[in-house]
Amino acid sequence: AMTRHYAVAPVWNFAIPATQGVDAVQFGCIAPSCDRVGRYYPVCVTLQVSASNYRPAVLEGSAAWYWQCGTALLQAIRHGVAPDQFDGQILAAARAGFRTASGGSDDILSILGPTAAGASAQQRLGWPELPLCFDAFGSTSYWWTNQADGSPLRTAAHGGGLNTPLFSKLFSQGHVPWA
């Protein structure tokens, strides 16, 4: 039952606050995958931003980056993209950078390169209220479906560490056959 749900689970975007011993917030995407011999595992792309430098404009301007990373994950999983090509797509997303709410480049992320231009759907964060809710030093992580493949928006807030109940909710619609 788990594999049936896992195989069709969406790509999830996340924003994870700084936690014990880690002075960085983590933004990224995680997707279900299966190798040629049938082993299931998640594939993850992350970007770390110093927690002390985080401000809401970072998330406000992250939509194109999430879109591009989700697209790269989907292509890799569905079409067997070579690792070098996948890495190139992720690095290109990072070089494209983030846009701030004002449309300019954010100083924190200036190391990522110039801002990206793209379609309006790619420029809107799927969860527009998130920048107002996310606390870089809090204990709640936020998860929402990546919509690069047309998946409907689903959201989740999770208190505490990354654990079985969280991944069960994301990848098996709450079914935990091993529990």
Regions found by a protein language model. Name each.
Residues 13-14:
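Acidic/glycine-rich phosphate/pyrophosphate-binding loops and surrounding catalytic core
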Residues 20-179:
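Long protein-protein interaction modules used by eukaryotic assembly/scaffold proteins
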